[in-house]
Amino acid sequence: MTRALLCSGQGRLARNMFDMVKSGPAALPILAAANDLLGADPLALLASADTDTLLENRTSQVLSISRTLCSHAALGLRGPALVAGYSVGEMAAWSIAGLWAPEQALRLTARRAELMDAADGDAGGLGFVRGLDAGQLMRLLDAHDCAIAI
């Protein structure tokens, strides 16, 4: 059987996103690396931080990639036949494919988020739209001087 793994991008964070993997030994080095980057235990951060803090680009991206890497490590798979990532999920995909270690993927993810924030300034933002047809969406984009970039 051929295995494929798709690593999601920065999406909705859930406070229980590590519940299935947090007690497994495979997650410990990944969570430790995330702790070093976030300056806080990821599990404690998810439990106590306010929503704005969790949605900060760097925090959200590091948590998202940590979750993916922990999940893959918990499965104990030796690299799927095919691995792909969407947006920041590419960072996890490259690690899972063997390009770099999970800790390096997290460091690069943090740096990626910092560079994105520096390039963006205060005028930008990212949005998610569901449930509108193309015409409705285009009218909203035009009315608010927005564009689809992904």
Please report, for each region that a protein language model flagged, where it lies by residue.
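A structure-centric signal for secondary-structure junctions around beta-strands
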Residues: 1-2, 123
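Helix-rich "cap/lid" substructures immediately adjacent to catalytic or cofactor-binding pockets
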Residues: 2-84
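Basic, gly/Ser/Thr/Pro-rich low-complexity segments located predominantly at protein N termini
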Residues: 14-16, 44, 90, 94, ...
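A broad detector of short, well-ordered amphipathic alpha-helices
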Residues: 32-33, 66-70, 90, 103, ...
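Gly/Ala-rich beta-loop-alpha elbow adjacent to hydrolase catalytic centers
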Residues: 68, 81-89, 93, 101
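Alpha-helix C-terminal capping segments
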Residues: 73-76, 94-100
